[in-house]
Amino acid sequence: MAKDLRIVTVSLWEIIKIHSLTFVFGVWIMCKMSAKWVWDPKSFFTLQQRDTPPACLVDSSLGQHKYVKLKGVKFHYVECGSRDLPLVLLLHGFPDCWLSWRHQIPVLSQHFRVVALDLKGFGDSDKPSSRKTYRIDMILEELQQLIISLGVSSCTVVGHDIGGLLGWCLAHQFPELVDKLVAVSCPHPNVYRTSLHTSSNYRWLNFVQLPYFPEVDALREDVKIISKYHKHLPPHDTYLEAYKYAFCRKEDWTGPLNYFRNLLFIEVAENSRTIQVPVVLITGDRDKFIKLESIVKSTDYCEKFQVKIVDGARHFPHQERHQQFNEILLKSLVKKKSVEDGGLERSASKGIVNRMFGAVSSTVKYGNSVLDTVHKKTNGVVGSIPTINLLSYANIYDRTDS
């Protein structure tokens, strides 16, 4: 599918399984939609008209709003920081836009040139409706062209959710473009796909494979799905209204949903080389969409990695606990002298280590499999779970040595 077959299409059996589940869950969710419509049609079709963008979407205090046209597609992005500094490319998730990084742009721009992109189909970027225009090979080539158009040969990529999946794929397909990868609330694509059956939104992911109906469902009850995903924002919050403005039309949903309609059908080739550049995986300890086990398994695809847990955060740690998140991000991205002990940069916060251990040991459902993964990664160094040393455990989650 893509250059050198690093990103490939899943097996025929997987494709058949996805389409079969699409039919089953599609019928089920459409029946639920019909029941809600019959029960309360007025509420179901409520959609507030939003003609004027909230000030925060067009405010230039976070940076300059710019546009670039690549392969016939217009991309919108916000840029901040000196052009002489290393580039950090921020890729938002779903349902979101460049504004997702409002707490990170001011902090990062003190050390980096920051570009917060509206992905194709989102925000003020073009929104082609065709599903094929969101094929992963096309998306990656456009990101490659974007980085080149910014006048650099490589950059640090920070991606959340869908943006994280694209970051993983970009690091595999065009490793020369990525200096460092930060994946926020996002496991490796192969782990993401194989762990979907344990995800709380598994039915929805299969439902969105259908045409038209998922877009209609997203608009019901005044774009209720936005409030569902952004629970950390209070009702009538300025930023919540900004998101509702950005997703208040049917065509505002087709592009974003097309990512899911394509990403479920791809994987990184098993013979693909592990990612050589440093990878930082950041997740909230209360994320119901992403399991800690999937984050740990994702390190199998990395040569150098760090795993960081944001205490008290769900799926949007960079917004919900932005101060703690920014501290982790800066510590990971801004170069500092490593400790003398083998060049390994240990976590500065013992509290984070304890929370990580607590998250694993207290989660009975998948704790054993996580610890098994840890055991494999240490080649038997951690031999007995009851006597595991917290500092050794921290080192496993911060493998930054060569």
Please identify what each model-predicted range represents.
Residues 2-66, 72-88, 115, 122-158, ...:
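Flexible "cap/lid" subdomain of the alpha/beta-hydrolase fold that forms the substrate-access gate
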Residues 84-85, 95-103, 114:
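Serine-hydrolase catalytic-loop signature spanning alpha/beta hydrolases and amidase-signature enzymes
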Residues 93, 320-321:
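Active-site helix-initiating loop/hinge in glycosyltransferases
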Residues 99-102, 168-172, 326:
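Short, hydrophobic alpha-helix immediately C-terminal to the catalytic nucleophile
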Residues 100, 119-122:
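Recognition helices and adjacent regulatory flanks at domain boundaries
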Residues 103-112, 149:
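A short, Lys/Arg-enriched amphipathic alpha-helix followed by its capping loop at the start of a domain
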Residues 106, 117-120:
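N-terminal cap/lid subdomain of alpha/beta-hydrolase-fold enzymes
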